[in-house]
Amino acid sequence: MKKTLIFLLVTGLSLATNTFVSAQQKGCDPTTGKDPLGRDCGGAVQTAVPFLMINPDARSGAMGDVGIAISPDANAIHFNASKYAMAPQKFGMSLTYTPWLRSLGVNDIYLAYAAGYYQFGSTVKQAIGVSLRYFSLGSIQWTDYNASVLGEGSPREFETAVSYSRQLSKFLAVGATAKFIYSNLATGQSPDGGSTKISSGRAGAVDFSMTYKRPIKMAAGTSTLMIGGAVKNIGNKITYLRSADFLPQNLGIGAAWEIPLDQYNSITFALDLNKLLVPTPNPRDTAIGANGLPAWKDKSPVSALFGSFGDAPGGGQEELKEINFSAGVEYWYDKQFAVRAGYFYENAEKGGRRYFTVGLGLKYNVMGINLSYLVPTSSQRGPLDNTLRFSLLFDAASFKDTEDN
């Protein structure tokens, strides 16, 4: 598919800000920080390369995008790499395909994702994980302000990641992930028709994660409580033109409780909380930093990380509004058939994404397949509205079982 865009819009895209405009932000007075009704202006948090936050896992995608503390599989590196050290299998891999903007009739934008891990160590479990994320924005025809054709391009972004995780005790594991990020949105194009060219963005980042796992005896068997936490995408800012934008630094905390119902049936309840660790735009902050940018945008990544818990112009109440909630449930029959459902909530002032998710999982011999479907519940349109996505998984235990048979 060929998309013709006004060059000004492409320039805006090259800034790669993950911004959603809410009704309260319209008509905001920068001198008072109030909207026409006297309410504090909602500040949608802005980051570059938002593709890093796209959930690539169809299993998690069917459970409202929870993933920090659910039982580990090959896609754990996206949520919480420390879970690899607690995986029951020594080896696993996955392939995921996520179509993008299908509800708008776009058919050449997609996210492809591959991940895998290998567990080693007899007395102390350790694991190495790897992943590759590729986001294609399709084919674009560049035009200038006068709609004159300048050529064609294929914007794309990718991320490679390597993780190491280690079990510190029977109940606790930690992990770290190193990443390289590349973003080519409009490389070589000039936003003003002059000599200034848009460059490709490059960045390095790290994740740190931990998982606590505790068995709890019940009448029907032993249940498993998992609690996890992860700080993700801590790295340098990414630059396309003169200014630099923050990576989507994020703090996530999650819990999941897997409960056996009988010999063949089990159910898991999970909850995740996520908050971006970057500055909240403040229309009342007119200070200019050393690089000529607004002071809130001119902070270092580390300063932004620690300051993000108290920089919202609306105070503590607005900080709480920046927390996204995900809740999900997963039912398994005989560890071969799964039914999943979930809900995702984001405050209206911070984007307004709200949706239900449903999905199925099937496992047979060496292969498992997960499907998920997203049903929006708010007026805020999303790129995954009414979209079916799927993941394929392979694990070492399945290979061993097949050989034994």
Feature roles, as predicted:
Residues 1-27, 275:
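Bacterial Sec-dependent N-terminal signal peptides
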Residues 24-405:
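Subset of outer-membrane beta-barrel
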